[in-house]
Every structure is written in C-alpha cells, then in structure tokens.
C-alpha cells in the first residue's frame, strides 16, 4: 500500500530544486520527460505511485504543486523538455506577477489573499490520493515567496490536514558572500518560527556548505545555481529511495522521521552524502565498501551544513540514519556499525541510546553509476543550533537599529507593531536553548523545572 506524498514547490528556489528533483526521479524510474515510461524500463519492482500518478493514457504525472508569485522560473520550466510532465492545473502564478520582492511580510500577506485558490489545487491532489501520508515543501527561507508564502502555507496545512506529516527541504542562505537581500535575517527568523512550530521534519540545505562542498570536493571554481541544485536533488532523491524502492523497513515517511526525531521540537536534520562525483571526475573512482561509506559520512567535510566550532558546548548526535544504496551484504553493515561504535567515531547524546540506523536500498537499475555503494546520512545533531544562532546574531544587529523595517510596515501583520518579529526571536531562542540542553544528561527533565 503506497502512502502518497504531495510535493509543494514555492518561489524561485523551491521551483528550481523541485525541477531538478523531478528530473532525477524521472531518470531513476525510467520515465521520459513527457511522462511516458521508457521501453527499457521493464523492472516493475519500484513504486512510482508514491510521487507520481497515472493519467488516463498511462503517462505519469508528478504529485507536485508549483507555486510562485512571479512567473520567471515557472515559465522556464514550461519551456523546458519537461513542460508536458506536470499537470498544468497544478501550476499557480499570482495574477499581478510582481513577486514578493524578497519581503517575508509581502509573501505572507499575499498568501492570505490567494490561499483559497492554492488550497483548491492542494485539496484536489489530496483527494486524488488513496492514502495520503503527507506533504513535502521545497523553499528557501531568505527570500520573499519561499519564506513568506511558505510560512503561511505551513500554518494553514497544519489547520487543514492536522494528521498529515509535513516535511520541508529548506534552503538556508549562503553566509560566505554578501546577500543582495538586506532583510534576509528578518525573513529567515520569521520562517524559522514556522519551521519550528508547524513542520514535523526539516531537512536543512545550507547554501554555505553546499558551495563549499562544490568547490572543495567537486573542484568547481564558481559553482552555479544549477550545479548546487543538482547536489540538492541528489540529497532529495536519496532521502526518498527507501520510499520508492521499498525494503523491509523505512518504507514510509513516518518510519524515516520516527527513527531520527525522538523529541518533537528538535526536528532539524542535516545531511551528508558520499561519494560525490561530477561528470568530469569519474576518473577518481575508488573501491567503495559499506564501512568506507559509513565512515566517510561521519566526516564533517561531507556534511552539508556549515556549523561553526563551538568550544563551550559539547555538541553530539541525537540520532543518525544512513541510507545505503547499492549492492550491500547485510553482514557488512553489522560489522561496520560495530567498528564505528568501538572506535567512537560518533559522539552521541548522554541521555539516550546511540542510535545509528541503517536502511538498505537498491539503486535505480536504469542509471549508470561509477560506484557500487553510495550513502546518504540524515542526522539529527545538536550543532545545527549554530545555524540558528548565526541568524539570530544578524537579526539582532538589524533589529537594534530598526533597519529596513519600513518595508514590513506596509503589510497588515506589521501595521500596528513588530510583535511578530519579537515572538519569532523568542521561539528560535527557545529552540537554540533546547538543542544546547540536549547535549547534557539532564535533558530528560529539561523544561519541567521552569514552569
């Protein structure tokens, strides 16, 4: 019984990474850009219907909703070879097409105006599923549409579908270069409040780290957006392989999430992937064994979140799930886990078991791969809080000077006062505090003393 997942793509970033994700899924399942199953795709052991459904003429259509407040990216998708893949009724562009101007408040208040049209699309998709498991939201947190409209939709999804899971792939801004969005810290903080309160699981895609990996590991001098987005689509497709090539465990979203998130608020995950290769570097193929892959996944340089060195806090893993793709002998997995535990390659929380789970998954039979084994690590690690601390520091600088707030004042939510900003700041601070508390043995009783 497949549990379907509806993908919501928001704004420029969300639609670009979503586009790469669907390209990747089509390649893995042997589906042509028009949605027709290729003649060579005869192995019927994959589950296409988690992410696709079939039209009357047998071609596959993604369960995706494409939303944007300005037309550029969606038009480029509609002019690509994949234009016929999507259901045109599932594409929503706002009528005036002016975008949200990288302003969270603008994206949020436009969400209030257009949410009925958007939910007509989402409800229709949900009604077309046999047993909908949840939603996956792709967006960035720094701009206007992905952050503002994304925040609004997260709140509404919780009201409308309280029992469905909401997982997000959230792109965090690149800290190494100057941003062209001056209000980025405001946008990020306001979105983080919703990600904390309204999502069940947030996969953090940190542009700072993705750029670093592209330059250091893939040796690309100035990585373009499309190269970074390919990295992202690799993560997204690898994190859903167990849903699409079902094994005996982790073959639905709740199974993936349950093993990684023991306490509800600490649901921000980081990812690592190995071995990374681009088309040019196939020459550097090594022999990959399960132990190699699992050991490399624990190396900080393969982790796609740039967390600073925090000497005061003893950061540790809350839980790890490694999704290993390829030809793997299960006894090897057991040995590798023992080796990792013996050598203490990973530092775990003091208040619970050292949870490293391994899900084995097949590779797509239709994609040539240079490696026998590749792996994706999804980890819940307390050092993710340093990302939120960085956002808070930047926010505090701007807020102290009340910089750029007049852009927000124009919208209803900030007409009277800026309480929404201040409560968001408090909620993100509580999240940071809880991550710090999770590094200590007394975390189990944390939050009970204060009341």
Curated annotation (Swiss-Prot):
PROSITE patterns named in the record: TUBULIN (PS00227)
PTM field: Phosphorylation at Ser-131 by BRSK1 regulates centrosome duplication, possibly by mediating relocation of gamma-tubulin and its associated proteins from the cytoplasm to the centrosome.
Coiled-coil regions listed in the entry: none
Membrane-spanning segments: none
InterPro entries named among the record's database cross-references: Gamma_tubulin, Tub_FtsZ_C, Tubulin, Tubulin/FtsZ-like_C, Tubulin/FtsZ_2-layer-sand-dom, Tubulin/FtsZ_GTPase_sf, Tubulin_C, Tubulin_CS
BP-aspect Gene Ontology terms: cytoplasmic microtubule organization; meiotic spindle organization; microtubule nucleation; mitotic cell cycle; mitotic sister chromatid segregation; mitotic spindle organization
Protein's cellular compartments: Cytoplasm, Cytoskeleton, Microtubule organizing center, Centrosome; Cytoplasm, Cytoskeleton, Spindle
Pfam family membership, one: Tubulin_C
GO cellular component: centrosome; cytoplasm; gamma-tubulin ring complex; mitotic spindle microtubule; nucleus; polar microtubule; spindle
UniProt keywords, alphabetically: Cytoplasm, Cytoskeleton, GTP-binding, Microtubule, Nucleotide-binding, Phosphoprotein
Modification type Phosphoserine: residues: 131
SUPFAM superfamilies recorded: Tubulin C-terminal domain-like, Tubulin nucleotide-binding domain-like
Gene Ontology MF: a single term: microtubule nucleator activity
Residues where GTP binds: 142-148
Organism superkingdom: Eukaryota
Family that this chain belongs to: Belongs to the tubulin family.
Subunit structure: Component of the gamma-tubulin ring complex (gTuRC) consisting of TUBGCP2, TUBGCP3, TUBGCP4, TUBGCP5 and TUBGCP6 and gamma-tubulin TUBG1 or TUBG2. TUBGCP2, TUBGCP3, TUBGCP4, TUBGCP5 and TUBGCP6 assemble in a 5:5:2:1:1 stoichiometry; each is associated with a gamma-tubulin, thereby arranging 14 gamma-tubulins in a helical manner. Gamma-tubulin at the first position is blocked by TUBGCP3 at the last position, allowing 13 protafilaments to grow into a microtubule.
Function: Tubulin is the major constituent of microtubules, protein filaments consisting of alpha- and beta-tubulin heterodimers. Gamma-tubulin is a key component of the gamma-tubulin ring complex (gTuRC) which mediates microtubule nucleation. The gTuRC regulates the minus-end nucleation of alpha-beta tubulin heterodimers that grow into microtubule protafilaments, a critical step in centrosome duplication and spindle formation.
Protein name (Swiss-Prot/TrEMBL): Tubulin gamma-1 chain
Native organism: Bos taurus
Source species taxonomy: Eukaryota, Metazoa, Chordata, Craniata, Vertebrata
């Amino acid at each position: 019984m497949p549990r379907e997942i509806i993908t919501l793509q928001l704004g420029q970033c969300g639609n670009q990474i979503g586009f790469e994700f669907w390209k990747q899924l089509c390649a893995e399942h042997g589906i042509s850009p028009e949605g027709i199953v290729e003649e060579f795709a005869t192995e019927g052991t994959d589950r296409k219907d988690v992410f696709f459904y079939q039209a009357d003429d047998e071609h596959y259509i993604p369960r995706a909703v494409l939303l944007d407040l300005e037309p550029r990216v969606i038009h480029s998708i509609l002019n690509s070879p994949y234009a016929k893949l999507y259901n045109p009724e599932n594409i929503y562009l706002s009528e005036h097409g002016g975008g949200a101007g990288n302003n969270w408040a603008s994206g949020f208040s436009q969400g209030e105006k257009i949410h009925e049209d958007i939910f007509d699309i989402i409800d229709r998709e949900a009604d077309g599923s046999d047993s909908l498991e949840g939603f996956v939201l792709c967006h960035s947190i720094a701009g206007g549409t992905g952050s503002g409209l994304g925040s609004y939709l997260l709140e509404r999804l919780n009201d409308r579908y309280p029992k469905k899971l909401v997982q997000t792939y959230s792109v965090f801004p690149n800290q190494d270069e100057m941003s062209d969005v001056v209000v980025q810290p405001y946008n990020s903080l306001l979105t983080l409040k919703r990600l904390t309160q309204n999502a069940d699981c947030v996969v953090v895609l940190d542009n700072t780290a993705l750029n670093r990996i592209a330059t250091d590991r893939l040796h690309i001098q100035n990585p373009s957006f499309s190269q970074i987005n390919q990295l992202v689509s690799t993560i997204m497709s690898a994190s859903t392989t167990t849903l699409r090539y079902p094994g005996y465990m982790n073959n639905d979203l709740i199974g993936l999430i349950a093993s990684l998130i023991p306490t509800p608020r600490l649901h921000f995950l980081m990812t690592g992937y190995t071995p990374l290769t681009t088309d040019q570097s196939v020459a550097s193929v090594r022999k990959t064994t399960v132990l190699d892959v699992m050991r490399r996944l624990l190396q900080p340089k393969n982790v796609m979140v740039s967390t600073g060195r925090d000497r005061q806090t003893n950061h540790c893993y809350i839980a790890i799930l490694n999704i290993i793709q390829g030809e793997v002998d299960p006894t090897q997995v057991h040995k590798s886990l023992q080796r990792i535990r013996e050598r203490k390659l990973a530092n775990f929380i003091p208040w619970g078991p050292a949870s490293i789970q391994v899900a084995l998954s097949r590779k797509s039979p239709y994609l040539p791969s240079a490696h026998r084994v590749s792996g994706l690590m999804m980890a819940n690690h307390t050092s993710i809080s340093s990302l939120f601390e960085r956002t808070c520091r930047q926010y505090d600088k701007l807020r102290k000077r009340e910089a750029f707030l007049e852009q927000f004042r124009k919208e209803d939510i900030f007409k009277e006062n800026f309480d929404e900003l201040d409560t968001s700041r408090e909620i993100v601070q509580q999240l940071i505090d809880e991550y710090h508390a999770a590094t200590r043995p007394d975390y189990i009783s944390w939050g009970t003393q204060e009341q």
